[in-house]
């Protein structure tokens, strides 16, 4: 199914309007959709809604769709498709989203949202929604039919809790049914669903993605969770992470969705790898480093990690083991004593002759990734060779 040329022209003409009113439209969209369909609150991240992150992310997605409406095949749907499958998004959710999105456009733009504009966007949404539905159906099928695979959630038991630093704990999960578990590509995440009671007594399912932090195993999954400081009831950032730290114990059961995500190392490539992480952003990169050492011991890996100080430095022993292998070059920076990672410091860690061929993976706070990304580009790393993972709604760095 393709869009008519008339609809393409109309949507292109709405780009300036979306640049001005996009966030207002998506904010209105979420408000109206949740009011009419409160069950969807069990799919979306409440903190991201409260902080406006999800609204901004959706506004950017809609804007990019409008800009590329004549070349939708150029849009990278994979990150969103993986998120949707991890969250359990189904085909029947798309008409709900479409109805509320068009309604929000009309509510915000009022008379400027003519029948012609709404018709064009309705047609476009149908095409885009079908592209997502088809891609998600294919991913659901592959995920479910692989060895040890499953669909939706599966019950796991907390086998171990290990303190990695003063604010990070690793959780080891084994399947409650004792059956095989699906493997994963280093860099992927699993999704945990936690029922929590809100202040008003209402119970909601909170869903969070956590990077898998170990090399793939046939016996367990490992995630490593940071405890958030100064949690307030009025501002419940880290509500799931802090719940895991405080209340989830060895022997408890949890519900997990299968591994997902497209932020992964190409294990068929021999290109050098540069890993740069900040704080708990180390988790997917540690998995990449350990798996590469195990499967491609001759592949060059440089790992640069920044943490506040030794107290907050996670996985010190595992980083030491990587370094002792003489196959992975490890550098740690403690910002309290060493300062932030700078372009000059990065130059000391890297091999200048490999810059053009190196695949780079960055993970950490958005401000950290933005700074590192800028420094790497200034050093000559091709933009297309730099990948980053954001713990939250998709955005640019």
Swiss-Prot record:
Residues annotated to bind FAD: 189, 208-211, 390-393
Site annotation Involved in heme-bound ligand stabilization and O-O bond activation: residues: 30
Xref: CDD domains: flavohem_like_fad_nad_binding, Yhb1-globin-like
Textual note on the cofactor: Binds 1 FAD per subunit.
Keywords attached to this entry: Cytoplasm, Detoxification, FAD, Flavoprotein, Heme, Iron, Metal-binding, NAD, NADP, Oxidoreductase, Oxygen transport, Transport
Pfam families per the UniProt record, alphabetical: FAD_binding_6 (PF00970), Globin (PF00042), NAD_binding_1 (PF00175)
Catalytic residues as annotated in Swiss-Prot or TrEMBL: 94 (charge relay system), 136 (charge relay system)
Site (Influences the redox potential of the prosthetic heme and FAD groups): 83, 389
Cross-referenced InterPro entries: Cbr1-like_FAD-bd_dom (IPR008333), FAD-bd_FR_type (IPR017927), Flavoprot_Pyr_Nucl_cyt_Rdtase (IPR001709), FNR_nucleotide-bd (IPR039261), Globin (IPR000971), Globin-like_sf (IPR009050), Globin/Proto (IPR012292), OxRdtase_FAD/NAD-bd (IPR001433)
Family per similarity comment: Belongs to the globin family. Two-domain flavohemoproteins subfamily.
Domains: entry comment: Consists of two distinct domains; a N-terminal heme-containing oxygen-binding domain and a C-terminal reductase domain with binding sites for FAD and NAD(P)H.
Full protein name: Flavohemoprotein A
